[in-house]
């Protein structure tokens, strides 16, 4: 994958330096793909770490419960949340120690900026649908004196598999317009179809989707490119309903090693 804004690489280097200033890390992950959206390449193992599964309202409920148990069995602290959850509920779940100095991280479009703004109690930073929109690194404080460090989203410089790229596409962490490899679209559709029980082939599904949405070229030919753009944008936004794109039992030891912090 060639898409990798320079500010994300810069932030990754800075985060390694800033880890010495904090004692707690909150990893914001998309509940629809908790493994794929943990792809940092930064080792947080020496810090108290909270895995925050965001967007649980658009993830499959049973699968989310499996992920919570999966992380708990690994001895990790995990909480769940969503955009509509009140600030006081989120703060209670996080239950930071008064002396906490917190680093909040997340790959693009996991909802990290929304979490940050909710904790601030006001919409103080730019929140948008484009991955990597928050470019600065800054501190802010909660009412009880807890200090929180905001960071941009982080992605691997090298997305090492079609499977990972496909899942990041499905949750919106990779911009759909930057995908140049048809195989990634095909793999993403395969994952989506398996998740909700679609039996149509890739070509059948998108030809039908294009016709239903009026995405046609001259002569009534389905515009597959526009169909792909619209479909994957809507899936990332949660318009396909409550669906998860990976399960704990599908993650192999090799995959876990590939995404281990460095």
Swiss-Prot record:
Q: Which residues form the signal peptide?
A: none
Q: Which residues form the CP-type G domain?
A: 12-157
- GO annotations of cellular component type: cytoplasm
Cytoplasm among the record's keywords? yes
Report the principal subcellular site: cytoplasm
Q: Name one Pfam family in it.
A: MMR_HSR1
Mind telling me which InterPro entries this protein's record contains? G_CP_dom, GTP-bd, GTP-bd_ortho_bundle_sf, GTP-bd_ribosome_bgen, GTPase_MTG1, P-loop_NTPase
Q: What domain of life does the native source organism fall in?
A: Bacteria
Q: Which residues form a coiled coil?
A: none
What subcellular compartments does it reside in?
Answer: Cytoplasm
Instruction: Identify the keywords attached in UniProt to this record, alphabetized.
Output: Cytoplasm, GTP-binding, Nucleotide-binding
- The answer, when asked if Flavoprotein is one of the entry's keywords, is no
Q: Which CDD domains does the protein's record reference?
A: YlqF
Q: Which PROSITE patterns match?
A: G_CP
Kindly list the positions annotated as binding GTP: 54-57, 109-114, 153
Any GO MF annotation of the entry: GTPase activity
Its Gene Ontology biological processes? translation
Q: Which family does it belong to?
A: Belongs to the TRAFAC class YlqF/YawG GTPase family. MTG1 subfamily.
Described purpose of this protein according to its UniProt entry: Required for a late step of 50S ribosomal subunit assembly. Has GTPase activity. Binds to the 23S rRNA.
The name this protein goes by in its record: Ribosome biogenesis GTPase A
Tell me the name of the encoding gene: rbgA
């Amino acid at each position: 994958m060639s898409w990798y804004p320079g500010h994300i690489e810069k932030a990754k280097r800075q985060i390694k330096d800033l880890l010495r200033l904090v004692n707690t890390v909150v990893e914001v992950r998309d509940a629809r793909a908790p493994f794929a959206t943990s792809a940092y390449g930064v080792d947080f193992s020496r810090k108290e770490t909270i895995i925050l599964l965001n967007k649980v309202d658009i993830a499959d409920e049973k699968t989310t419960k499996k992920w919570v148990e999966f992380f708990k069995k690994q001895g990790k602290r995990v909480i769940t949340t969503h955009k509509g959850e009140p600030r006081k509920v989120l703060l209670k779940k996080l239950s930071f120690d008064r002396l906490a100095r917190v680093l909040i991280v997340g790959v693009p479009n996991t909802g990290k900026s929304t979490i940050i703004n909710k904790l601030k109690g006001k919409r103080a930073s730019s929140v948008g649908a484009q991955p990597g929109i928050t470019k600065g690194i800054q501190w802010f404080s909660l009412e009880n004196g807890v200090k929180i460090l905001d960071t941009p989203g982080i992605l691997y410089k090298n997305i090492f598999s079609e499977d990972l790229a496909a899942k990041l596409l499905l949750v919106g962490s990779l911009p759909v317009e930057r995908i140049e490899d048809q195989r990634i679209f095909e793999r993403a559709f395969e994952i989506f179809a398996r998740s909700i029980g679609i039996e149509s082939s890739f070509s059948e599904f998108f030809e039908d989707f294009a016709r239903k949405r009026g995405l046609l070229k001259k002569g009534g030919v389905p515009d597959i490119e526009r169909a792909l753009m619209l479909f994957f944008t809507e899936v990332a936004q949660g318009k396909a309903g409550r669906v998860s794109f990976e399960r704990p039992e599908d993650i192999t030891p090799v995959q876990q090693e590939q995404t281990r912090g460095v």
